[in-house]
A protein has these predicted regions:
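Glycine- and acidic
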Residues: 17, 65, 185-192, 271-272
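Generic structural signal for well-ordered, non-membrane alpha-helices
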Residues: 77-80, 84-87, 121, 200, ...
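Acidic, glycine-rich loop-and-beta core segments that form the ion-binding/anion-interacting portion
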Residues: 157-255
Length: 279
């Protein structure tokens, strides 16, 4: 049975699953069915004792961890570039502003360290959240592992090995010690808060660049063939900074989504998160 399952681990029969979902209206069970068609000998043990959240929630945590690692790499690169710029411009005098009114002298490099420091704060938050991410593991329908107690005839010693084995297999240090049917949706709020924090720092940076471009102190790259406006081709709009601000607004506004989901989970779980969590 196990060898049969291994032989079909990567050739997912999406067409069979798609047609089955029209009947069952359940994404995970449709794939369980499709896997069973490919592995008739193992059909009776596929997904045995598990839940849909064992599949979906553990996958989501893995995806979030990989995504945060990607964001971390890009964030470190941004900090490095800002540090380089700050060093190069540390003696370049400029006028500081408070309330966007002329204040006292500073340097271009000093101002850049303000941007850099906020991204460094975001990096600290990201490292903490990434380091604290754990898998759901396999806790059963309500977090008690009752199905495994039955499958293993009450052998608690064997059951206690399940979550550590899952964590090790998936490259994590541990699984959350307790859960309902799902991992706590507070986890999602942590991740989105980090992303929203990065977005806020990026937005502040883009604001300053746009204001400085208006003052003719710093200007975005402008290509030879670039057109500033369909009606005013001579314009040199700060479109890169505007793109940053626009995307940052979306990320920051999305921060409320997981907060609302976490606050409306009833007891061991509800399905309020089914659609918007995927978005």
């Amino acid at each position: 049975q196990i060898e049969e399952m291994k032989s079909h681990a990567d050739d997912i029969n999406f067409e069979v699953a798609k047609e089955r979902e029209k009947v069952e209206r359940h994404d995970v069970m449709s794939h369980v069915y499709a896997y069973g068609v490919q592995c008739p000998k193992a059909k009776g043990i596929i997904h045995l004792g598990a839940t849909s959240c064992y599949v979906g929630d553990n996958t989501d945590i893995i995806i979030m961890a990989e995504a945060l690692k990607l964001v971390r790499t890009k964030l470190v690169n941004v900090i490095a570039e800002l540090a380089k710029f700050a060093e190069e411009q540390k003696n370049q005098p400029t006028l500081a502003f408070t309330h966007f009114q002329p204040a006292q002298p500073t340097t271009v490099g000093k101002r850049a360290t303000l941007w850099m420091q906020e991204f460094e704060m975001d990096l600290e938050d990201l490292e903490y959240v990434l380091g604290s991410l754990k898998l759901l593991g396999s806790k059963g329908t309500t977090g008690t592992q009752a199905s495994f107690l039955e499958l293993f005839d009450g052998d608690q010693e064997t059951i206690d090995k399940i979550d550590p084995m899952i964590a090790e297999k998936m490259g994590f240090k541990a699984c959350y010690p307790v859960s309902g049917q799902t991992y706590s949706r507070k986890v999602d709020t942590r991740v989105l808060n980090v992303l929203a924090g990065i977005a806020a720092s990026a937005h502040k940076f883009s604001n300053d660049i746009r204001l400085l471009q208006h003052l003719k102190e710093i200007e975005e790259p402008f290509e030879k063939t670039q057109i500033g406006s369909s009606a005013m081709a001579y314009k040199r709009n700060p479109m890169r900074s505007e793109h940053i601000a626009s995307l940052a607004n979306y990320v920051m506004s999305d921060m409320m989504n997981p907060m609302l989901v976490a606050s409306t989970q009833w007891f061991e779980r509800t399905l309020d998160d089914s659609a918007n969590k995927r978005l």
